[in-house]
Amino acid sequence: KAFGLTIHNTISIKNSIEDDIIIEEKTTIEDMNKSDWNKWMAKNNIFDWDGLVYLEKAFKNNTDQFNNWDFFYYTIKDKKGKILLMTFGTYGIWKDDMLATESVSKQLEEIRKTNPLHLTSKVISLGCLFTEGKHFYVNQEEELAERAVKLLLDKLEEKYNDLKADMLVLRDFEEKNTWDKVIQEQGYFKINMPESCVYNAEKWQSYDDFSKVLSPRSRKHFNKEIIP
């Protein structure tokens, strides 16, 4: 599931920070504590610290505006410094037909040959277009968990207004999750996302191990195009 929201009002993040919780924002994974990040986020897809370093190198400072993103990272803690929530997101250009049928996209791609920004939007999103899966960690056992989620939503809304984005997207949530009601009460609506594939990597622990289970053709592509 993803949540989308079009917002027109302005909110000050100062009004969302309370005495017993605080939110920290960074613009690169290299400014995040590696051990803390990996403790809570590493098990979710390619979201470990080194994986985000790779994504930043691949999708920052590019001449192609569709592959040039701004990254941001949030950590919310209680007054004792205990982590309540961690997440990351990106700001970039999305094609409006990403969830449309193939025939619709083909027609639009023909138009984009001469008008690249045709039917595109500036989007703030949890995660990025390269990733799938749970893009945030919340310590649900803490009493302050719900307030931490609401503070995150306030901060994202402020960023949405500051950047004059067209859309704010929270993704990817399980169909039934703890924060459904909280998020929808903030004005978001649900959008069904395409099915994804999860590969259980129990049989390999390294790139070399993984390449051994590939076909000769796939192994050649992996070694030449992916590993570098």
Model segments located where?
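N-acyltransferase acceptor-side catalytic subdomain
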Residues: 1-228
